Amino acid sequence: MSMTPKTPILDTVNSPADLKNLPLDRLKSLADEVRAETIDAVSVTGGHLGAGLGVVELTTALHHVFDTPTDTLIWDVGHQCYPHKILTGRRDRIRTLRQPGGLSGFTKRSESEYDPFGAAHASTSISAALGFAVGRDLKDENRNVIAVIGDGSMSAGMAYEAMNNAGHIGGRLIVILNDNDMSIAPPVGAMSHYFARLVSSQRYRSIRKLGKGVAKALRVEEAARRAEEYMRGMAMGGTLFEEMGFRYVGPIDGHDLDQLVPVLRNVRDGDNGPVLIHVVTQKGKGYAPAEASDDKYHGVAKFNVITGEQQKSKAAAPSYTKVFAQQLIREAEADSRVVGVTAAMPGGTGLDLFGERFPDRMFDVGIAEQHAVTFAAGLAADGMKPFAAIYSTFLQRGYDQVVHDVAIQKLPVRFAIDRAGLVGADGATHAGSFDIGYLGALPGMVLMAAADELELSRMVKTAALIDDGPSAFRYPRGNGTGIEIPDQIEPLEIGKGRIVREGSRIAILSLGTRLEESLKAADALAAQGFSTTVADARFAKPLDEDLILRLAREHEVLITVEEGAVGGFGAFVLHMLADKGALDRGLRIRTLTLPDVFQDQEAPFDMYETAGLNARHIAAKALEAMGKDDAAAERVAAALIAG
């Protein structure tokens, strides 16, 4: 249920220029209207809600004080950018967020001049902003560069690498630390209030205890001075940033425009050099359901604004993520060496369920994929059985560690690659397109792709038994097929696929969940008189050479199908067939992959339709290879639609 809010001030805002002369009282009212508009828009489209609501006042203040787009404003991750989009001329399209042909759910350079740098992954903003700042100085220009980064993103080493470099360069750069988890310090109105709360805190008492120990070794006066400096630095959060060459300002209340606006003006008009402003905010601010449960309202489906109830359809089958978690729990019950590692995505990867059962064996390392991989490598080297559950798109961030710390040392880290393939509304930045190619290139890697929930369970079991090197299994976002999973799961034979359907003229070799579409294509082809074999490869590495050579030998046409980019499974098959001389007799072979483009957001089925990987495309490709005309393909397509 959505009731369009009344927004008289926002109705007059077409660009940030319209905010410049607003007095503070009207600026506060504008922020309230932006918050109401954000809530209403996301209730219609779904998307990231809590983070955006937490930065409404900050966004309003930034566009009031700074001269965007002349001043460069970069949002880390970008999922909090909905208020920013509303204020930068995109309000008329805000209810197309994450829809086909609509606004991206993140910042996007091609969408607006107010998005100077795109994002969707964490911790990139300071590096990018420093690049803009250095470019500005080399061109002798006079403009501000601002990066807004959340405290969660500060858990990634890249943010500190950028700050270290920025402090060394010493140029003018403004970094705003949006502390929405209160992980560094609480908001303050006055220092006296702050220290009143501080001295009653466990943190202060721990530091005071430490101070007593120090006093035994130092003169009382010197000990007191050093303890005070240490306490203030730890509590206020500024010492680390100042040591890196930043002037530290804060913490300040990120929802109080009376504080935000003058501080931003002072920093804007202040001295050169890097500055960090520590702003404390609350996720979901101003919307009671989101304030009460910020984790459930981080990313939401369409919802009723009045009740907060999300409109989630009841699943007919469990999600692949849940199936993975349940099987991992079974493995951990049988083997105390099984542990789970995730990089700030316990809920998304299912490791929250594992952690409920085994709290001492689940490790959330924060937004730190590089560390996650090498941490898992260390666990493996010490005899544990780590499962690193990471989204395909985020595993890219730790690829050097996969190569250097895992593969070269032949350490048995098991990579559970969630969100493999196309993911829908989050678009290109979150697609799991490349892992088959970049993992399949590594010597000794065992790489599997699940066709359904039972196959995924068997792959978890198989990975748990691999102790002589790394392994990985990939599976998509969303629900499974509904296949029954028995209590006793049998492992797979390494490098062996399976024949799912026997035929004689055309062979379709599927890797992953395109198996269902491949079977539909085979039915349609058979109805037109083309007997079709369907095989599930299971393994992208090592390949089942015997199976593939048999398919090549006994059929006129061989089609490979995968939910991955060019240079993946199909390329591996072609390389093997060429090496074995199987192409010499004139086999007609085609590889169906994701297209060589970055696809924008659509519903998952529609994304695969655009990609040409649904049943009608598979059948059409087979008919093309058989030399049949378009009319035959049209008949098959019509049969599939009718079916």
UniProtKB/Swiss-Prot annotation:
InterPro entries xrefs: Dxylulose-5-P_synthase (IPR005477), THDP-binding (IPR029061), Transketo_C/PFOR_II (IPR009014), Transketolase-like_Pyr-bd (IPR005475), Transketolase_BS (IPR020826), Transketolase_C (IPR033248), Transketolase_CS (IPR049557)
MF terms (GO), sorted A to Z: 1-deoxy-D-xylulose-5-phosphate synthase activity; magnesium ion binding; thiamine pyrophosphate binding
**What top-level class of enzyme does the UniProt entry assign?**
transferase
The cofactors named for this UniProt entry are: Mg(2+); thiamine diphosphate
Query: Which superkingdom heads the taxonomic lineage of this protein's source?
Result: Bacteria
Reaction(s) the record says it catalyses: D-glyceraldehyde 3-phosphate + pyruvate + H(+) = 1-deoxy-D-xylulose 5-phosphate + CO2
Q: Where does thiamine diphosphate bind?
A: 79, 120-122, 152-153, 180, 287, 369
Q: Which GO terms describe its biological process?
A: 1-deoxy-D-xylulose 5-phosphate biosynthetic process; glyceraldehyde-3-phosphate metabolic process; terpenoid biosynthetic process; thiamine biosynthetic process
- Name the residues that bind Mg(2+): 151, 180
* UniProt xrefs under Pfam families: DXP_synthase_N, Transket_pyr, Transketolase_C
**Free-text remark on how the cofactor is bound:** Binds 1 Mg(2+) ion per subunit. Binds 1 thiamine pyrophosphate per subunit.
Q: What is its EC number?
A: 2.2.1.7
PANTHER family noted in UniProt: 1-D-DEOXYXYLULOSE 5-PHOSPHATE SYNTHASE-RELATED, 1-DEOXY-D-XYLULOSE-5-PHOSPHATE SYNTHASE, CHLOROPLASTIC
Subunit arrangement? Homodimer.
Q: State the function annotated in the UniProt record.
A: Catalyzes the acyloin condensation reaction between C atoms 2 and 3 of pyruvate and glyceraldehyde 3-phosphate to yield 1-deoxy-D-xylulose-5-phosphate (DXP).
The similarity annotation says: Belongs to the transketolase family. DXPS subfamily.
Protein name per the record = 1-deoxy-D-xylulose-5-phosphate synthase
What is the native source organism of this protein? Maricaulis maris (strain MCS10)
